[in-house]
Amino acid sequence: MEMLTSLSFLDKGEEWPPHSQTERLKKYADNRKRFKNKLGFDRKKYNHIISLVGNKFRVIDYKFLVNFYKKVSLKTSDLLFVEPPTISAGDDETKNTVIEQIKDLSDLDNIGAQAAIDASRYVDALLTIRIPSADDEETQAQAYIGITSPLFWFPVTSPMNLKEITQHVIAWTSTETIIENGKEKEVTYLDYQIHYKGHYERGRKYVEKGTIGDAIFVGQPVEVEDEEGVIGKQVSELERVDTGLSSFAIIPAQNVVTSDTIFAIDDYDDFASLVEELQVRLEKIAHVLDKHADPSLSGPTSALTYDEETGEWFLKMGDYYHRNSKEDPAVEYVTWDGKLESSFQEIELLLDLIAVLSEMGSAIFDRDSLKGSGLSGRALRLLYVNPLTKVRRIRNRFDRSFKEAIALCSEVGYEGKSVEKKDISIKWNDGLPNDKKEDAEIGVIRTGGKATDTIVAQIMEQDGLTKEDAEAKYAEIVKETNARLLSEEPEPNFFEDEEDEGEGEEI
């Protein structure tokens, strides 16, 4: 795939969308349909399958759509954000307050979950820094984090370094109905934003038959001076919007990226063909079972009855059909061995390969939870070794992207209380349920005879509380313990009198 190295793809007469990006955009669109289980019928794959299985199974129409794609993406998102990460700036209360404000305004946990799904299905998730107007009472002109679809993303890289993005272009088409010469006419527009560090430019152009046309002047009138020194007003094609940010307002949060491209690798390609083959096998099995449920009959001609009205012979069920000898055929259902055992064995093999290539292991099927077996925390994490490793790769990239997004947001509208990227710490969780017994055993060891942790810290870890809440809870425990000790009467000492009497005796 060729990279875009200039903004010339937005010029008049250029093809839209750019030819070099059509393969990427098609993959995005296909994966979006796969996620929604709406990819539909693929004629090329159908013809290939028919060439293998023959005309007998031309009824194959993909009515069994096994949506492993959605399962993989949702599982990835769950392991990242179903247990929200803890974001802080150490002990700096001012910076922590700013971070909490950004999280609340952005609905960051929900945005993160959406970004994880996009990184899985599209390979590229795009975080955006939204700069509201000063009149926005809800945000009070404070920047917050949003998300946009990579279907609208056209990054421009440096010709000298294809890994260096010089501009982010966000572009999309829309259709409107206008009145021209008294008649309705549909017009297609291309709206676009060219993002630079600290500002972006937005414009609009006509698109006709897939080709970019004239620009529509959208900028504010500005005073210009012509060659004769006459000052007039001119409207530009582009309108400049200052963001007040030190970097781009577009921040990619991606899946695995290789050294020869700026686009990531999606989760679906490696096992898509296996899912399609699995759907064919299920369709064939269903066809065989349907035929067995409505079988044909065989028997002697004497079993048939002639219908004088229709002129057709038919088999009247429930009658007695005599056989003159053992050699005469009996009336019976025609059945055959569909060799379903082999089909089920192949299905098991396909499922195993899907589990391996999706890097989800047996966790993708949730077989243990469906059987009702209770796994310990250690066993559950062993079961999820592959998914957790896969998610950790994405997490490493998300960590950098979310820190950058939070730091950029803090630059606009937070009374100058900006938070630097290096000050932000994100504690990621794995989304798996904790084993209370194992946690308690660890806690006893860590606070017992060889204590390596404070009781307050253990309360924070075991109960998921903040430091202030944990200290308050510990103070309440100490208070109740002291009150109980004071209320208890001391046990009587039955030997006290004997000891007192023995003190005055002489020996």
Q: Which functions belong to the PLM regions below?
A:
Residues 1-167, 175-179, 499-507:
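Extended, helix-rich architectural segments
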Residues 433-458:
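C-terminal structured domain segments
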Residues 86-94, 98, 322-442, 481:
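Surface-exposed loop-to-helix/strand elements on domain peripheries
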